[in-house]
């Protein structure tokens, strides 16, 4: 590797990773609530460990959801269905400690997101952010999904690892797994090759390491990674510890919100610190991060920058963002100040405006809780639309 080249690494995890189990349970509960009550206020945290799951948090709703059933169904769907896997959806204990949302927070957000198909301008203006905070969105044109290459391939490999387990191709695989991909960038900051792939997968006790390594290369890596990105110098580490039988919540406790870099851009962009899963769309940690991605992706798709990072920031109880910042890392075709002006004029970034713009009061969140919230091609997510391209092009020419 020449001195002008650099390496960058990102990771992903499978849906059976303990932290991802927790994320999926939290979002499954959110979705069940939103199906029956689109205005439910939800902040649901989950902890999973050997033989049990516990859900805690604050939920305000007029409807009823059978939380233990949602938990068990989610764990079963992931694939923990037998005691010998270290976690069993039918025999695990499920505990719940749920409170109502604090009235102090509610009064900051409320003045009414009631049961209506349309939210009036007055209601949008009157709906404040549920907390202070800063959120980032990012996009780059180095992949068709407008995602950085390392996290793109990490997610693709992690998803493939799960697919070959579920479809029976590799019956000895178990749900827990991790992937890490290191990409080499040239002097023009373009991805040119994959330097290292690390895959660790939980497996049955009676399979050999040689068999695992051969099968993962054949059934997981080769179908996903183009041969043009691999060479004789590419390093493959498949189950480098030699054994991964004990996994999932039996191996490590899992918590909602501990995979925020996996959920976003793999460390390629900055992060405001707030997680997504288990939070209804009045929480700007989630909705504003989605809006920031929507803005950044449309800027790049419009050809106004090769890469773009958008920061939004909010004050609790205040509708308008306190700041909008855009960084194009020297790739912008127009001044960043002009992009900020165009964004202010063409995107409603008030909390209720984001909810309306992206139609977020729907049960769409569980599908985001594994394999990334951004750049997905397997599910239709509203913040991945590129429907503001023409508007932005016109705005920066004005």
UniProtKB/Swiss-Prot annotation:
Coiled-coil segments on the chain, per record: none
Localization in the cell: Cytoplasm
PROSITE patterns assigned to the protein according to its UniProt record, in alphabetical order: ADOMET_SYNTHASE_1, ADOMET_SYNTHASE_2
InterPro entries in alphabetical order: ADOMET_SYNTHASE_CS, S-AdoMet_synt_C, S-AdoMet_synt_central, S-AdoMet_synt_N, S-AdoMet_synthetase, S-AdoMet_synthetase_sfam
Main location: cytoplasm
This protein's GO CC annotations: cytoplasm
GO biological process: one-carbon metabolic process; S-adenosylmethionine biosynthetic process
Cofactor: Mg(2+); K(+)
A Pfam match: S-AdoMet_synt_M
Binding site for ATP: 17, 176-178, 243-244, 252, 258-259, 279
Catalytic activity: L-methionine + ATP + H2O = S-adenosyl-L-methionine + phosphate + diphosphate
Family listed: Belongs to the AdoMet synthase family.
Assembly and oligomerization: Homotetramer; dimer of dimers.
Role summary: Catalyzes the formation of S-adenosylmethionine (AdoMet) from methionine and ATP. The overall synthetic reaction is composed of two sequential steps, AdoMet formation and the subsequent tripolyphosphate hydrolysis which occurs prior to release of AdoMet from the enzyme.
Protein name: S-adenosylmethionine synthase
Source species: Staphylococcus carnosus (strain TM300)
Upper classification of the organism: Bacteria, Bacillati, Bacillota, Bacilli, Bacillales
């Amino acid at each position: 590797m020449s001195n002008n080249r650099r390496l960058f690494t990102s990771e992903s995890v499978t849906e059976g990773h303990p932290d991802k189990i927790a994320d999926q349970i939290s979002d499954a509960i959110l979705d069940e609530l939103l199906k029956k009550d689109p205005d439910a206020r939800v902040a649901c945290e989950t902890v999973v460990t050997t033989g049990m799951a516990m859900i805690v948090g604050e939920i305000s709703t007029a409807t009823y959801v059978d939380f233990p059933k949602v938990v068990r169904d989610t764990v079963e769907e992931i694939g923990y269905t037998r005691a010998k896997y270290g976690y069993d959806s039918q025999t695990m204990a499920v505990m719940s400690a749920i409170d109502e949302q604090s009235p102090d927070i509610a009064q900051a957000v409320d003045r009414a997101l009631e049961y209506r198909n349309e939210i009036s301008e007055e209601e949008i203006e009157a709906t404040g952010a549920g907390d202070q905070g800063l959120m980032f969105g990012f996009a780059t044109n180095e992949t068709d999904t407008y995602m950085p290459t390392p996290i793109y391939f990490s997610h693709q490999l992690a998803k493939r690892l799960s697919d070959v387990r579920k479809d029976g191709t590799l019956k000895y695989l178990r749900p827990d797994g991790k992937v890490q991909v290191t990409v080499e960038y040239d002097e023009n900051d373009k991805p040119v090759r994959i330097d290292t792939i690390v895959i660790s997968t939980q497996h049955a006790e009676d399979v050999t390491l040689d068999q695992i390594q051969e099968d993962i290369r054949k059934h997981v890596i080769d179908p996903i990674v183009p041969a043009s990105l691999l060479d004789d110098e590419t390093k493959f580490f498949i189950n480098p510890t030699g054994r991964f039988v004990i996994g999932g919540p039996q191996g490590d406790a899992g918590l909602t919100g501990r995979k925020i870099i996996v959920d976003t851009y793999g460390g390629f962009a900055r992060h405001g610190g707030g997680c997504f899963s288990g939070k209804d769309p009045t929480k700007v940690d989630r909705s504003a991060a989605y809006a920031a991605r929507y803005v950044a992706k449309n800027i790049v798709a419009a050809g106004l920058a090769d890469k773009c990072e958008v920061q939004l920031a909010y004050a609790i109880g205040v509708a308008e963002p306190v700041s909008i910042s855009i960084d194009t890392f020297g790739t912008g075709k127009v001044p960043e100040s002009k992009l900020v002006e165009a964004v202010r004029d063409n995107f409603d970034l008030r909390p209720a405006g984001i909810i309306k713009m992206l139609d977020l009061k729907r049960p769409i969140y569980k599908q985001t809780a594994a394999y990334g919230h951004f750049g997905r091609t397997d599910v239709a997510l509203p913040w991945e639309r590129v429907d503001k391209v023409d508007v932005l092009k016109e705005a920066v020419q004005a």
